[in-house]
Amino acid sequence: MIPPRSLGSTAALLLVLLFTTLASAIKFDLPSNAHPHTKCIWNYALSDSLVIVTASVVAKEPFDFSHQRVDIEVVDGSQHNNVYLSKKAIKGETRLAINTHSHADLGVCFKNTLTSKSGNQIPVVTIDLDVDIGADAVDYNAIANQESLSGLETEMRKLEAVANEIVNEMEYLKKRELRMADTNLSTNMRVTNFAILTLIALIALGVWQVFHLRGFFKRKYLID
């Protein structure tokens, strides 16, 4: 019989994994413009993570795509500013797959360009975006069919992948914390050294002032 405490811990872990595996989905309208601004949807992703981007682009009635062009670009916010994919004139459902190179925010960016005017109205598209990262991007149904896994085994395989992602993220956070601690230590040492040098300089200046004034007073015969 499993102890109640173990059951509680297992349930808590499963709840954490469940909420961690939620995919990012959003739906929004994007009006066209001759000089369009770029709208980006950002999600954090670890390095070497599989990311599946599914974008459904539909022109809002009464417009079509004859007067507007939607471009998509997948980038990240790392210091390298990686551009993973760039595709122009997308319509309908577009599915993109990438592998990340850095621990950074991953941006899926859209731009709707007005190619020609259509009366006084501005053409608009509706974008339904779904971003799956890591374990959520893996097709476990295909794996289950290939390896003849049961439903429970498939779920356990998925939870195992999510748990590995959590471990990797915790390791990354630990390394980042160590780097920040090293930076703080280095900064504190520099501040301490600067304070010591400043104190030594003030003492040296004070000693010099004493000898200078002593010599001045002797020349003026104010002291012996």
UniProtKB/Swiss-Prot annotation:
- State the Pfam families in the record: EMP24_GP25L
Q: Where in the cell is it found?
A: Endoplasmic reticulum membrane; Golgi apparatus membrane
Its taxonomic placement starts with:
Eukaryota, Fungi, Dikarya, Basidiomycota, Ustilaginomycotina
GO cellular component labels = COPII-coated ER to Golgi transport vesicle; endoplasmic reticulum; endoplasmic reticulum membrane; endoplasmic reticulum-Golgi intermediate compartment; Golgi apparatus; Golgi membrane
| Sequence ranges on the Lumenal membrane side | 26-190
Q: Which InterPro entries match?
A: Emp24-like, GOLD_dom
Cytoplasmic compartment segments: 212-224
Task: Report membrane topology.
Answer: Single-pass type I membrane protein
Q: Please list the GO biological process terms of this entry.
A: endoplasmic reticulum to Golgi vesicle-mediated transport; Golgi organization; intracellular protein transport
**Chief location:** endoplasmic reticulum
Keywords from the named record: Endoplasmic reticulum, ER-Golgi transport, Golgi apparatus, Membrane, Protein transport, Signal, Transmembrane, Transmembrane helix, Transport
Q: Which family does it belong to?
A: Belongs to the EMP24/GP25L family.
Official protein name in the record:
Endoplasmic reticulum vesicle protein 25
Source superkingdom: Eukaryota
